Structure formats: C-alpha cells, structure tokens
C-alpha cells in the first residue's frame, strides 16, 4: 500500500455503556454516527498498563500522544516514580539530596510546589509524601508545602480531603502547609500570564486570603460556588497573621509535578525570566524539578531526565522522504508536536506545523467550539493541494470542554467536532486520503458521576477507532501503541524494530 493518511484525534472522546451521562450520546453527531455503519471500526485501550501507566490509571493527552507516535508502550513517569517511592530509591537521587543539602548548609527554606491529589495525571500525593519522608531522614528543617488544588483530574470538591490527609501525614513525617492555590492559576499552559501572576503573588508576595484554618477557607469557597480548580491563593498564617512561608531569594524550591506542560510557566516566572508587564520578577533560587520541564531553562536541577524516544512515527516518515503536517490549537499543540515526536521539540525534515490560538475565555464552556472551525479551514486548504503524505490533527473540544463538567457545553463541543470531522474527512477522501478517526483517552462520554455530581476527569473507557477507507473492510481492536504501525502499514513504509506494537489491519 502507498496511501496518504490523516490521523484525526478526537481528544477526550470515549465509549460508554451509559448513554444518559454521555455528552457524545446526547449530542447530534450524525456524521460520526454514520461512519460506524459504513467503515471498518474497532476500539482502543488508552489506560493503565496499555499505555505504560499503573493498572487502573486513566490515560491523558500527554501519555496518549506519546504512545501514538512511538508505536510501542511508553513507560510513564507515574509508574517510574511510584516504584522509586515504594522501593525507597527516590531517596538516593543526587538532585534531590543536593537540594536538601543546599538548604541545610545555607539555612534556607525548602518550598515543595505541586498538585496535591491522587489524580495521577500531573502528580500524585504519594510522591509528595515520599519526598517529605526523605526530608525527615535528611533532618531538613523549614520544609513548606505550597499545594495546588486539583478538582479536574478528580472530584471538583475533593481538595479539603487531600489537605486533611496531607496535614495528618506531615504530623508524623515533616513539613508544614504554607498555601493552597487552584491549578487554574498555578498550572496554566496557555500563556495566560495574568493567571500565573495570581499564583506568583501568593507564593512570593503574600497576596491572598490569610487564614489559620485552611480547610474552613476551602469550604467557604465551595459555599460560594468555587471548586478546587479555582481557589485563589489561601495563605496559612503564623501567630502574627503573617504568611508562614513566602518564597524568598536564595530559597530552595522543588516542583514535584512530573508532567511537564503545566509546570513550565510558573517555573519560568519564578526562576527564568522577568515579566514586567505582570510585575513578576525572577528570583535567585535553588530550583529543582522532578522531571525536565523545558530544555531551554537555565540552572534547573532535574531529578529524572527523560531520554528521547527514537524512531517515532514522525521520524520514520521523514526518513522515508515523505511530507507531514502537525495541526492543533494552542491547548493541544505540544501534544501533536513534542509528545507525538517522543520528546523532540524541533520539527523533522518535511514536517510543517499549523497552530491556531485557543480562544481567550476563562473556561471553555463559554466557547465550546474553541478553534475547531479555524483548524478545519486551514487544514482543508492544505488537503486540497494533496502535498502532505501524513497529517496528525487534534480536535481538543471533547477533552477541554469535558473538563468543565458542564453537559450542555460538552454537547455543543461534540456537535462542533462532528461538523468539522465531516468537512476534513470528505475533503480528505476527495483528495486521496485515508482517515484514522481515534481518541487519545475518554472524558466527555462520562459527564456525570454515579452520585449525580459533575464529572470533570478523564476515564478508563476504551475509545473508538474508525478506518475511513473505501478498500479496507476489517480492523482489529488494540491499544494506542498499535496506531503508528498501522499508519506505516497503510503508507507502505517498513516498521522499525523499536516499534514493538502491531498493525491492526
């Protein structure tokens, strides 16, 4: 075969057995529905050990795109760090020990920053507990936790429970809670520096709600209609009503989020660059991250450095002398580039990139169409030329709007994707393209929890795989790692030995 291929990733679009909780089922998606009757289709697993995560752990976009591009199961940082905590090898890591040594020798505070939940997408509370235990073993004084509350990869009002759990743990281990800030502010990834500024001011300048009872302050926010994602800085105070710990010049900071995309901006503002328009000034800090957030960052100590994955789909297509396009809006741009390329930032030879800005709204329920129509128009213009041999396209709507927990908006998001998918697929067919319609993980198919509350998290459900091709009529079930071998099979390119998964044709 020598086909041209579009990989269309419907982010957050899973398969559920319970239609009443599904935005997809309740949306009018006549085109995607019609594909199941006309073309070969199967399902893909995107969770747990199928993508290199611990058993039962929901997948996510970073993990999904990495497995899709790699053509193999990529073992993830969550599993790696879980093992290091359990087997106590984390306490032997030089970068961590050096951080504590610096703080002790210079009589400086240690600030532990990160998402405090068991969501397992960006971090895990057990990793923080492991770090606290090592600090206790190393007899480090003045250890402070600045917790970022989740409410997105777990229940929207579970933050109080995690904070109580952490505070109980610190009584036996070491450390004190210094602040709680919602991830909306502390973990932006869309260059909304006005959000990062709010987190920065809480951490550095002591701007926020001051309290001695943090769980009561969280409950007040719940009562006012705010969920964990959106807490503005809550600062725990000392006897003189001053914040227990602000980040000062010369302090040690350890950012324990292992997923890289939502740790970059705050790290940048604290340690790399001044942002005068937001009145944020970088500090001279001993700064450590648990994984490598950005190769361009200077003077960052990294505990676990990832090796780039060799012979990913993009690299193999490039070496075969073929042309490829990566296209997404801002929210998913790193996923179709950096993650899909196995941790490589630079484009391969013959790779072009199309980026459309995500709309500047507070939350995507306010504009569930996002930038899907702009992506569609831009891509179809290229498809008409029929010069690209491979296209990797991401529609972010199902995931990003699914995360809001608002059913009506998620329905609108699904309907938008249906319209855009039709335009792209039909333009592709007209110009000789086979389309693989898949998802990277589930989300918007489960908008309601069993207790009736909104579900904002990913799921462990399988996802669809539809092969839109007039000639090929059968397809096997598989995992995300099987997609790259399937694409190489369609394109008539030899599969490299590093790709250990199989074509599903």
Regions found by a protein language model. Give the residues of each.
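Feature captures the catalytic ectodomains and active-site-proximal regions of enzymes
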Residues: 1-505
């Amino acid at each position: 075969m020598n086909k041209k291929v579009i990989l269309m990733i419907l982010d957050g679009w899973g398969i559920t057995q319970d239609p009443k909780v599904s935005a997809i089922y309740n949306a009018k998606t006549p085109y995607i529905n019609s594909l199941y009757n006309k073309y070969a289709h199967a399902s893909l697993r995107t969770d747990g050990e199928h993508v290199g995560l611990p058993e039962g752990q929901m997948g996510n976009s970073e993990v999904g795109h990495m497995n899709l591009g790699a053509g193999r199961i990529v073992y993830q940082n969550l599993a790696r760090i879980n093992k290091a905590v359990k087997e106590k090898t984390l306490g032997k890591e030089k970068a961590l020990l050096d951080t504590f040594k610096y703080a002790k020798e210079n009589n400086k505070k240690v600030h532990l920053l990160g998402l405090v939940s068991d969501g397992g997408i960006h971090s895990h509370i057990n990793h923080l507990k492991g770090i606290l235990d090592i600090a206790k073993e190393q007899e480090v004084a003045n250890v402070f936790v600045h917790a970022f509350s989740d409410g997105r990869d777990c229940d929207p009002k579970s933050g109080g429970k995690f904070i109580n759990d952490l505070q109980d743990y610190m009584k036996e281990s070491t450390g004190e809670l210094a602040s709680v800030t919602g991830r909306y502010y502390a973990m932006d990834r869309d260059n909304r520096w006005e959000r990062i500024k709010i987190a920065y001011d809480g951490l550095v300048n002591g701007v926020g709600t001051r309290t001695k009872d943090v769980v009561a302050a969280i409950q007040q926010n719940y009562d006012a209609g705010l969920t964990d994602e959106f807490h503005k800085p809550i600062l725990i105070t000392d006897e003189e009503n001053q914040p227990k710990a602000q980040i000062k010049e010369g302090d040690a900071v350890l950012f324990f989020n292992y997923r890289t995309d939502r740790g970059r901006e705050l790290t940048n503002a604290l340690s790399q660059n001044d942002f005068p328009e937001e009145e944020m000034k970088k500090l001279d800090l001993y700064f450590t991250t648990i994984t490598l957030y950005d190769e361009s960052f200077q003077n960052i100590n990294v505990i676990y450095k990832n090796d780039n994955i060799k012979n990913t789909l993009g690299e193999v297509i490039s070496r075969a002398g073929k042309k490829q396009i990566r296209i997404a809006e801002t929210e998913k741009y790193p996923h179709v580039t950096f993650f899909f390329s196995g941790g490589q930032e630079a484009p391969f030879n013959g790779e072009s990139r199309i980026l459309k800005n995500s709309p500047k709204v507070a939350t995507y329920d306010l504009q569930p169409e996002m930038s899907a129509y702009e992506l569609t128009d831009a891509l179809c213009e290229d498809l008409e030329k029929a010069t690209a041999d491979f296209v990797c396209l991401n529609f972010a709507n199902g995931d990003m709007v699914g995360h809001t927990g608002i059913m009506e908006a998620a329905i609108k998001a699904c309907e938008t994707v249906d319209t855009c998918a039709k335009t792209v697929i039909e333009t592709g067919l007209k110009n000789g393209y086979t389309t693989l319609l898949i998802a990277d993980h589930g989300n918007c198919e489960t908008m309601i929890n069993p207790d009736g509350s909104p579900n904002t998290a990913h799921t462990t459900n399988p996802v669809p795989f539809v092969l839109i091709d007039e000639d090929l009529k059968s397809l096997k079930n598989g995992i995300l790692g099987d997609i790259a071998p399937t694409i190489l099979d369609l394109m008539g390119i030899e599969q490299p030995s590093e790709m250990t998964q199989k074509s599903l044709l």
